[in-house]
């Protein structure tokens, strides 16, 4: 499916509870905040819309500014303790009225190593509004993932931190090479990390 029919949804509202006191999305990786790697890669593609679900601006002012500069519509999840499902629900509620959107590409801000080529593979494997296309490391299904419009009602009923895992496990699986699906949950997951000073 052409990216022009897809809304990219960047999930960046987690509480980073396992990362300690620092905001993991602001941890420096290769010279810039970790989240910047994902938001810039996704913004460089021709999606119908760029949507980011984030914490309130007082908790993540730098991320808000970077997203705004790159043209994202910012949706605030003021209850991040509800888990990833709450963020997905907010994004789907926003997208549903636009019938030109055939599906969403769910991306995680704590997966900084996913290249544009992989996002493209996910989108190209999506055929229509019934499609579900997930990434896999050969063991489990995960984002980045395409979820077609037909499944939006199911997404609106999600609860908790498992997100759309059950739905993704039944979709087309795009296997990755290397460690590109590595997500950062603790400081140890990010070699040489250091907190960034807010602008």
Question: Where are the regions that the model predicts?
Answer:
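Nucleotide and nucleotide-moiety/phosphate-recognizing core
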Residues: 2-141, 170-177
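Bulky hydrophobic/aromatic packing residues
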Residues: 77-80, 94, 151, 187, ...
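Conserved nucleotide-sugar donor-binding
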Residues: 140-153, 187
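Nucleotide phosphate-binding site architecture
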Residues: 16, 27, 152-153, 191
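Short aromatic/basic micro-patch
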Residues: 113, 146, 183-184
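Conserved alpha/beta core of the MobA/IspD/sugar-nucleotide pyrophosphorylase nucleotidyltransferase superfamily
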Residues: 1-5, 153, 157-199
